[in-house]
A protein has these predicted regions:
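Active-site/catalytic core of tyrosine-dependent DNA strand-transfer enzymes
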Residues: 8-15, 59, 80-140, 173
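C-terminal catalytic core of tyrosine-transesterase DNA break-rejoin enzymes
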Residues: 35-46, 132, 147-173
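Hydrophobic, well-ordered secondary-structure elements that form the walls
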Residues: 79, 130, 153-156, 166, ...
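Hydrophobic (often cysteine-bearing) scaffold residues that line and stabilize catalytic clefts
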Residues: 10, 29-30, 79, 83, ...
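Short, contiguous acidic/charged loop-to-helix segments that flank catalytic cores in large enzymes
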Residues: 5-6, 22-25, 66-76, 103-108, ...
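Catalytic-site neighborhood detector that most strongly recognizes the C-terminal catalytic loop/helix
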Residues: 8, 66-72, 84, 106-108, ...
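Short, polar N-cap/turn motifs at the start of nucleic acid-interacting alpha helices
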Residues: 54-61, 140, 161-182, 204-211
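Basic, Lys/Arg- and aromatic-enriched nucleic-acid-binding interface segment
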Residues: 1-50, 58, 69-73, 93-94, ...
Length: 211
């Protein structure tokens, strides 16, 4: 099968996707997880394996531990209003369990059943959901879940946000010996500024009646 080309989504596509993801015939944790990727610029695997113990709703931060980060470095992810709203919504489904965007067949079918654990979504969950339900999303050109992360980064650079800061927000591996030591100062406030910019851009895109 031919792979979908890497790309960033335009504003019309973002509007359509955000408003149509809920039409997909999948568990809500998948649609919420996809939106969460765009809000936080995080990787699909990071979202799928996010645990409630890593989320600080009051502090508005998600701490991805080093053993889960692709580059092996702890990553503090600031949470904007969109991300917090998604977490409050998914909490109704998985609150009290292990994984934020996890799945437990018994609990999802019978909410009265008491369960303490759920399972993280399969590696292919996001990709499969979008591939099978693409016709429901309302855009012409196919895209991958990772394109949501890429789109967030593109939106930031398009309004003049520094590529260096975008790289830190994406938790890319620093180049050079000196750069590899920068994590003693996490640049959290700079990353929060970027996440707030994403909120502002999404507000502008999603507040219109139609595009």
């Amino acid at each position: 099968l031919k792979k979908t080309a890497k790309r960033s989504l335009d504003t019309r596509e973002i509007y359509a996707i955000w408003n149509n993801l809920d039409k997909m015939q999948v568990t809500p944790v998948i649609t919420l997880g996809l939106k969460f990727m765009l809000c936080t610029l995080t990787r699909g695997v990071e979202v799928r394996k996010a645990e409630w113990s890593e989320i600080d709703l009051e502090g508005k931060v998600w701490v991805i531990p080093n053993h889960k980060a692709k580059n092996g470095r702890r990553h503090l992810v600031p949470l904007n209003r969109f991300a917090l709203d998604i977490l409050q919504e998914v909490k109704k489904l998985t609150g009290g369990l292990q994984y934020v965007f996890g799945w437990n067949r018994i609990k999802n079918i019978d909410h009265s059943r008491k369960v303490s654990k759920n399972h993280d979504l399969k590696d292919t969950a996001f990709n499969h959901a979008m591939r099978v339900n693409f016709d429901q999303i309302g855009i012409d050109q196919k895209f991958t879940p990772h394109d949501l992360r890429r789109t967030g980064a593109t939106l930031l650079t398009s309004i003049g946000y520094s590529r260096d800061w975008v790289s830190k927000l994406l938790n890319h591996t620093p180049s050079g010996v000196t750069a590899s030591h920068y994590d003693t100062f996490d640049y959290f406030e700079e990353k929060r500024a970027g996440i707030e910019c994403i909120q502002y851009i999404l507000d502008r895109i999603l507040s219109v009646q139609s595009i």
